[in-house]
Amino acid sequence: MYLGHVNMYVRNAEKSAEFYRAILGLHTYHTAPGRAVFLSANKEKSHEVALMSVGDDAPLQAKGQVGLNHMAWMVDSLDELKVLYQRLKDANVPFDHISDHGLSLGIYFRDPDGNGLEVSYELPREKWPRQDQVFASDVVNLGLFPGPWDDDPKYSRRSRLQEPAKATA
């Protein structure tokens, strides 16, 4: 099983689609003028996101309200995440936060309708730490995700990794 698509209500699907194309590089598969736009990062799929227009006066979802917290997109390399970081800065898209999760680094921001988005890079499986290291009580930054965000005030090194135990003779 895998996730097929996410269907999101937005004020104006065409306007929101411009954001998703410019910032995330998504491709439009189909547009139903005034009603919906279907987008995908994968040209082999019809859509991964369906944006449905509900009108310019529709209220925004309040933080902490029941509903979708955020939608996460993955990139294949830390370099791709660096490119996205710069694209967001160049477009003056404010960051909610940038978090080192130990296994991954995520950049969190919002679309024009306030929907939460994350783009992240995850370490290859063979580099994952053991679970007891990820959930350890000591916060240690191992520097696994160096990048332009290092000095960004929105960057939080929340990694809960510890150095691997050294073998004793």
Where are these regions (language model features)?
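Residue-level marker for the onset of beta-strands and adjacent loop->beta junctions
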Residues: 4, 25, 35, 69, ...
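Core segments of cupin and vicinal oxygen chelate
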Residues: 9-53
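A short, polar/proline- and glycine-enriched secondary-structure boundary/capping micro-motif
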Residues: 50, 61, 128-131
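Histidine-centered active-site/metal-ligand motif
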Residues: 5, 45-48, 70, 101
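Vicinal oxygen chelate
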Residues: 2-10, 59-169
